[in-house]
């Protein structure tokens, strides 16, 4: 091969390599430019549907040990069920008949919806036997937006302890839709991302508290009824959000205190009991907030203490009622110091 031919061949090879590099570079830049202006895929959290909740095992045995199951449990027949053990799913009640659940040291930590959901029209009764402690937690996002949720009437009773943590997005602690909630007993502790105890829906439901020790710490309203609230007994401590726009108690209808002990605290909204209430009460809207962890006392004009408690959050509204209140003037003390706030009862 002649020397000139070799040189020409080398030049052709070099030019081919350069041309290839240029073509690859232009293609890559054009592809990047197209990707730059392509719409980004948004990660959307899927709301749990009824079909998702219905998936699982249908169990209608009298004794149910949650440790034996790795999916939701569906109860479809009326009757009384003894529940024990723990799992990370949901206990679904789907019956038109009355269902009673006896919680015997149960632990439910649901990943996608309510820990206990009654999705049909039958009444749900949750019994907390004496000497037991049960804990319910939920998270995710679903139409069953209470850690305990019921489409039918809901009754909670017993002498045991029940801890409820409503962690769903905008989730309630205990909730119904267009139906009543009745609490007849138990030591019940509720924390929630929204309302603690909620009877919602277009028609609402009446919340009735006859007995029990109830503690509520909510990021929304402590107790919210789209209908009525009646407190006949027990001890109720309810704290609404400290951020603003929420109350210890909020109802669309009547609000009666006929007995028991009630402490309802909030950030700015205040709803006082109806005058038809059979038990005396005092309510305050303060001009300056009382700080979290302050010790608060209510005393009469003779310096007798009526009630005392610790504020779990900053607050500016208070409703207080117990059997010691009668005609007279009452004063708020904070950390042992008498404040400017007083209220007279006729």
What are the roles of these predicted feature ranges?
Residues 3-346:
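A composition-driven surface/loop motif
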